[in-house]
Amino acid sequence: MPQFVDRVVLHLQAGDGGHGCASVHREKFVPLGGPDGGNGGHGGDIILEVSSQVHTLLDFHFHPHIKAQRGNNGAGDHRHGARGEDLVLQVPEGTVVLNSKGEAIADLTGKGTRMIVAAGGHGGLGNAALASKSRKAPGFALLGEPGEAKDVILELKSMADVGLVGFPSAGKSSLISVLSAAKPKIADYPFTTLVPNLGVVNVGHEVFTVADVPGLIPGASEGKGLGLDFLRHIERTAVLAHVVDAASLEADRDPVADIKALEKELANYQEELASDSGLGDLRERPRVIILNKMDVPDAADMADLQEEELKEFGWPIFRISTVAHKGLDELKYALMDIVKAHRKANPVEEKPAQVITPKGLRKRSGGRFAEFEVEADPSAEDAFIVRGEKIERWIRQTDFENDEAVGYLADRLAKAGVEEALYKAGADAGSEVTIGEITFEWDPQTAAGVDVMRSGRGTDVRLEQNTRATPEERKRASQARRGLIDENDFGDGEVAERERWQG
């Protein structure tokens, strides 16, 4: 089972919005209570939060499918549905979020920093919120919007102070095991280390962290070997330590050649970086050279032969043996001094917790008018596509099983100018029109240039046909019953309906 996971693909489904409620108030002696349907609750968001208690993406490796809670539906008596609970996923500091195309969306640093990675759908309005002067009791409500569904990639970049770099089998894992309490896998063959190992080194009352990353080979910046899986873990390190096998017997390998090959790959990788990590150019960070395996016969003689050339790099040189535990204390104190100097020269400001909202996140567009565009559908004749965030949201929220809801949608589209735009684009009655995921045959409600009808198609006729007697009529009915007036003695145009008077 993997213990360290630094790259995962998540399949996210934010919570759907709850549906609005279509309800009419019912109460004794209140026959015309009016609409009282409540709104649906918003769906839950999926949020990434930086936590100091998490150091790997291991949990997401086993549970990549993540779904947030749905909003509750509205109910009668103006009861609104509860909002779906947000789902907060804790990630380690240094996590980079990429979209499905591999493009970086956000770099999560700073404890408590949050990012809304998938937005929940908005709840639908109930018929109480849809009532107006011309539509007194709508017999429909709006549906809740579906939550965002997307795939994102999480990549973890190590946040160590010192990064151990070197060719495979140079002794990096052995070094971190003797400097700290880390227990990496150690064996005498290349690429024993396949994932980074992190260790904490105590130097008196001070500490620094060190990362043992997978071995490097020529062409790593182009993806060879472990390639970018190695290189991204040294982007954030403050100090780079070249670990060199001083006892290598290969003809084309020596300490100087190894370091030059490593530096070439680092330079190539720096040119590919899209943004600065905050620690400056990777090629300008402090470096040290660690000649390992000095306990091997002839290793010291080989190091002596290369001493002058190694000094030309201008970096401190340390000779150690992880097997014999020689030179380790001197190395630890030297690394601590370099780390302290680098921290002082590059102070890291404590970033306050913030909420990051990526540009691609779906959100409701404000304003009274809907922006849209109409274009011909290239895949079919006499077909058109209408694109617009607000227009497409109207489609998602319409219950197409309810004729009154469809009429309400048609009114909204006409008032927004969609019909006029379709006329100008060359559409005729019967043309196929696609909005969002819905395709329908266009049945224009108005001729070109004619104003839209003011009375909405969703008007409830029942409330306009009032059959109750007026107070004056009830008064005259009472007088007629008592014989004060003749019940047939009415003015022209009046109709005597005893049942109505007495009702």
Curated annotation (Swiss-Prot):
BP terms from Gene Ontology: ribosome biogenesis
Residues annotated to bind GTP: 166-173, 191-195, 212-215, 292-295, 321-323
Stretches with biased composition (Basic and acidic residues): 457-476
InterPro entries reported in the protein's UniProt record: G_OBG (IPR031167), GTP-bd (IPR006073), GTP-bd_Obg/CgtA (IPR014100), GTP-bd_prot_GTP1/OBG_C_sf (IPR036346), GTP1-OBG_CS (IPR006074), GTP1_OBG_dom (IPR006169), GTP1_OBG_dom_sf (IPR036726), OBG_GTPase (IPR045086)
Region: Disordered, residue numbers: 457-503
Gene Ontology cellular-component annotations: cytoplasm
Domain Obg stretches: 2-159
Keywords for the protein's UniProt record, in alphabetical order: Cytoplasm, GTP-binding, Hydrolase, Magnesium, Metal-binding, Nucleotide-binding
SUBUNIT field: Monomer.
Annotated protein name in UniProt: GTPase Obg
Gene: obg
